Each structure stands twice: as structure tokens, then as C-alpha cells.
């Protein structure tokens, strides 16, 4: 599957420090320790509707991770999936009387347009669940053969992972059983289904149902894959185990990231004989709210990137508005937030069109330090605000030739905000 065009990254003098990030599994900010190539997997969209600002905030957060790593001298192998077969997609297609394939392709194309407009660096591997079905089936077969999964005894052909045989289950989220059961019911699980060995056992394969698409499956049972095994398979097939960052929204902590890790670690153990970690760090972006509630498709309280673009809003203002809050802080989208970002963008652009400005070296160093410190984008933005104010207010003898160009390039390369005319 094709991703989207990569924006040009300006080359900055020197290099940035080690990136630290908050690891959900350890509950603390830790240094990332990539090898020569940093590896990151970020869970992608289910393409049944347009990109809303909650999505955008998540992908902008991990775009900063990508940029900071590159500035520190790492090559980056970035993988993102597309959940192009799942219940919400099929339900929306049926509701609207539209072919599910056509719906998924259209919304994926719109997502690409939004990411291009927001200047998000594209993944190196952009992989759909549908194209991964043969490998998913092979993985489910392996889990069945090893006695780690079972077929539900109700004639459906549905296959579940037996989490009683998953050492370390729960270590990624740290949730107790009651919390897991609640989130499982709210986020696509089926804890009350009869016949399961454990209420939390996740589905690996859903046997064919009337009116649903299906593919040849494990043990000859046609159907479609479960959600979590899709990401486990795609990660294993692209960047392998022990990658540096597993990323996504905070609503993916459980069950999705927990079970993706369980599946991948079980599959790897069948080969190596030992439990290896799926990811070194689990990093989660907070929610964007509107009118006091989390922005979500199920609630319908959405602000779409494409709609704002269609109204003439500069995508760089959208980007700045979302980066004005820390990625781990739940925050609200308001007209005032966008208006403030538009004003900030205009001020920065005025400042970088000058031939000379306030000294740039400390701004570049400060941007690097702030973003390397668990993606402190509000702190980074405040540094540029202060520089722009000094530049626009200073007299000629207080200014440094070429400083605006350096700041312009730094804002572009590190924050991903393109400033025109510099």
C-alpha cells in the first residue's frame, strides 16, 4: 500500500540529544536507545470516516519522534498499518449502502491528503490488514498448533488466544482485571461471550458470517482476522521484535497494544523458546476533546482536518494548534485555540522574513532540548515565540545576519511547521 509524499527536511548544523519518552509499561520517562536505525510502529486508522483532530494529534506526536530521532543522527524505520477490514468499516458501509472496499479506499486516500497537508513524515512501510491476511492465517495456525489458541466450540469457527498461557500478560497496561474487562467491553472485545476459557481471551480469527467478506483461514475455516493479530503480524513482518517505540492513542493501551504484544511474543517464543519483548517502549498520545467529551467517531463530536482545510484554514495553523498542548495531556479543541495558532503562525512568518534577527543558536539548541525531553512541544513553541518577539522588536544593531533562516529551518525540521518566505 502506498503512503504519501515526504516533505523536504532542512539540514541543521550539529545534532540533537537523546530522545526521552514516557513509557506506559514502566510508568516513567525513559531514554530511547535505538541502534543505528530507530524502529517505530504506530497503529493506523480504520478507514470508515475522515481524519479527525484526535487522529491528527496522535500522528503529529509520533511525527515529532521521527523528526527528533533523525536530527539526532538516526535512520528511522517507521511502520504504520491500515485496519482496512474491521467491524466499524463493515457497519458504516452497510449503513450507507456502499461497498466496504470503496469506502476504505476513499477514506484512506483522504487520510493521505490530510497527512500530506500537515507535513507528517510518511511511514516506510504502510501496510493494510487485507494484504496481510495470508501471513495472519499462518500465525493463527502456529498458535493453534502450539496449543496457545483454541477454536470456540459453538460451530462458528472463531479462534481465541488462551491468555492463561501468556506469561507477563498485563505488563504493558498495568491494569487490574476489572479495568481490563471494562475496557474490553468498550473497545471491541467480547468478555461476556459464552464458551471462552477466559473472559479476556482475544479473538484471533472470526469465522465467516453471512454478508461479510472472508478469506481462506486456519484449519480450513473461512473468515477474517481479529484486530490485534493484524498489528502483531505486520510488525513482525516489517520491523521484528524489540523495536524502539510502539505508538498510538491512549485508548489503545488496552486491549489493543496489550494483546498485540501477547500475540507477537507468543509467536516469537515458538521459534526462540524464550519470551522476547515486543517493543522497548509503549508511548501513548492523549485525547482531544470537544464540548467536554473525547472526540470520537462513535460520539459523532468530530472536527475533521479535511473540513478545516476546505474552509481555508492553513494546515500549519492546525499543526501548531495541536502541538500547543503536550502530547500526553488531554486537551480541548476550541475556536480560540485555532485563532491563537493562526496569529502565532503569522507572527513567526513575519519574523523569519527579516534578513537579520535575534541570535539563532540558542533557539536551535533550546528546540532540540525541549523536544528531546518527552516531546515538550509547548516549551519549544514558547522559545520560538520569544525569539520572534525579540526579532520584531529589536533595533538593527541588536540583530544577527542569517538568524531568521536558521530558525526557519529549525522550526521546519523539528516542529514540522513550514514558514514561508525564508
UniProtKB/Swiss-Prot annotation:
One of its GO terms (cellular component) is cytosol. Pfam families: tRNA-synt_1e (PF01406). A motif ('ERGGDP' region) lies at residues 186-191. Its EC number is 6.3.1.13. Residues 185-200 have a biased composition (Basic and acidic residues). Monomer. Belongs to the class-I aminoacyl-tRNA synthetase family. MshC subfamily. This is L-cysteine:1D-myo-inositol 2-amino-2-deoxy-alpha-D-glucopyranoside ligase. The gene is mshC.
Amino acid at each position: 500500500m502506498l503512503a504519501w509524499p515526504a516533505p523536504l527536511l532542512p539540514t541543521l548544523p550539529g545534532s540533537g540529544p537523546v530522545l526521552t519518552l514516557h513509557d506506559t509499561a514502566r510508568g516513567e520517562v525513559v531514554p530511547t536507545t535505538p541502534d543505528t536505525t530507530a524502529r517505530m510502529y504506530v497503529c493506523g486508522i480504520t478507514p470508515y470516516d475522515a481524519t479527525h483532530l484526535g487522529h491528527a494529534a496522535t500522528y503529529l506526536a509520533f511525527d515529532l519522534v521521527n523528526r527528533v530521532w533523525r536530527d539526532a543522527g538516526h535512520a528511522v524505520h517507521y511502520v504504520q498499518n491500515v485496519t482496512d477490514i474491521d467491524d466499524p468499516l463493515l457497519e458504516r458501509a452497510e449503513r450507507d449502502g456502499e461497498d466496504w472496499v470503496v469506502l476504505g479506499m476513499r477514506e484512506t486516500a483522504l487520510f493521505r491528503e490530510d497527512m500530506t497537508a500537515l507535513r507528517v513524515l510518511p511511514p516506510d512501510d504502510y501496510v493494510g490488514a487485507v494484504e496481510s491476511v495470508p501471513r495472519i492465517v499462518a500465525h493463527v495456525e502456529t498458535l493453534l498448533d502450539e496449543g496457545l489458541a483454541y477454536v470456540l466450540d459453538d460451530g462458528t469457527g472463531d479462534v481465541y488466544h488462551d491468555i492463561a498461557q501468556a506469561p507477563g500478560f498485563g505488563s504493558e497496561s498495568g491494569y487490574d482485571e476489572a479495568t481490563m474487562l471494562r475496557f474490553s467491553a468498550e473497545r471491541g472485545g467480547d468478555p461476556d461471550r459464552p464458551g471462552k476459557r477466559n473472559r479476556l481471551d482475544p479473538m484471533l480469527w472470526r469465522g465467516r458470517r453471512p454478508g461479510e467478506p472472508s478469506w481462506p483461514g486456519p484449519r480450513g475455516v473461512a473468515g477474517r482476522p481479529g484486530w490485534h493479530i493484524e498489528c502483531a503480524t505486520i510488525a513482525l513482518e516489517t520491523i521484528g521484535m524489540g523495536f524502539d517505540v510502539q505508538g498510538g492513542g491512549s485508548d489503545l493501551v488496552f486491549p489493543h497494544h496489550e494483546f498485540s504484544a501477547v500475540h507477537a511474543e507468543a509467536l516469537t517464543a515458538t521459534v526462540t523458546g524464550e519470551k522476547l519483548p515486543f517493543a522497548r517502549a509503549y508511548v501513548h498520545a492523549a485525547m482531544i476533546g470537544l464540548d467536554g467529551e473525547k472526540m470520537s467517531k462513535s460520539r459523532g463530536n468530530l472536527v475533521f482536518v479535511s473540513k478545516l482545510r476546505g474552509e481555508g484554514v492553513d494546515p500549519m495553523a492546525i499543526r501548531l494548534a495541536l502541538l500547543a498542548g503536550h502530547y500526553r495531556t488531554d486537551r480541548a479543541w476550541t475556536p480560540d485555540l485555532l485563532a491563537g495558532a493562526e496569529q502565532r503562525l503569522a507572527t513567526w512568518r513575519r519574523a523569519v522574513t527579516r534578513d537579520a534577527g535575534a541570535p539563532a543558536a540558542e533557539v536551535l539548541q533550546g528546540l532540540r532540548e525541549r523536544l528531546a525531553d518527552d516531546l515538550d512541544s509547548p516549551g519549544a513553541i514558547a522559545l520560538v515565540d520569544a525569539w520572534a518577539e525579540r526579532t520584531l522588536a529589536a533595533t538593527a544593531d541588536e540583530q544577527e545576519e542569517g538568524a531568521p533562516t536558521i530558525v526557519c529551518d529549525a522550526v521546519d525540521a523539528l516542529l514540522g511547521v513550514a514558514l514561508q518566505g525564508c
